[in-house]
Design a protein with these regions (language model features):
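C-terminal regulatory/oligomerization modules of transcriptional regulators
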Residues: 1-4, 126-151
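N-terminal leader segment of winged-helix/HTH proteins
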Residues: 1-31, 80
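Alpha-helical linker/hinge and terminal dimerization helices associated
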Residues: 16, 20-23, 27, 61, ...
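N-terminal helix-turn-helix DNA-binding core of bacterial DNA-binding proteins
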Residues: 22-66
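Basic amphipathic alpha-helical segments that dock to polyanions
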Residues: 43, 57, 72-78
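Charged, amphipathic alpha-helical coiled-coil/dimerization segments
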Residues: 73-134
């Protein structure tokens, strides 16, 4: 008898990802962060990578270029990020930087949401979290070899 899809690791990963996204949205709304979870992700990435081209940012935050552009438009309107045009390999690219205001916003939001995430994290053994992370990385590597995924 064939295994039902809802009993597979792939379904469990997708379901967990949806739970994480919903949890993130609820936490950001509950603590009145003033930005979305996706916008915070952008600020967090940029806070740790001072200058990044928009295309590389899109890959890291797992969004297409159009959605990344919309997120950046929203953040730029509030002076959390700035974009400048540059040339890379003879092609125009947009370089994104977090502003001081954006860095402050990311820090403020982290202070608001951190207790909630720590509460969830405390319920899971750290070695189990590391093990699951390693297994997921291994699974992605196998799928990358098998499917030639281009993200």
């Amino acid at each position: 008898m064939q295994e039902h899809f809802t009993n597979t690791i792939f379904y469990q990963i997708e379901l967990t990802a949806k739970y994480c996204k919903l949890l993130g949205s609820q936490v950001f709304e509950k603590y009145e962060a003033g930005i979305t979870c996706e916008e915070y992700t952008v600020l967090d990435v940029l806070a740790n990578s001072p200058k990044m081209c928009q295309r590389d940012l899109a890959k890291i935050i797992l969004k297409d270029r159009a959605n990344t552009g919309k997120l950046l438009d929203s953040l730029e309107k509030r002076s959390y990020v700035s974009r400048t045009l540059s040339i890379k390999n003879n092609r125009p690219v947009k370089i994104v930087e977090i502003t001081d205001e954006g860095r402050k916003k990311a820090e403020d939001v982290l202070e608001k949401i951190k207790p909630h995430y720590l509460h969830v994290k405390e319920k899971i053994n750290n070695s189990d979290v590391a093990r699951v992370g390693d297994l997921l990385k291994e699974l992605r590597e196998i799928m990358d070899e098998t499917l030639e995924i281009q993200i």
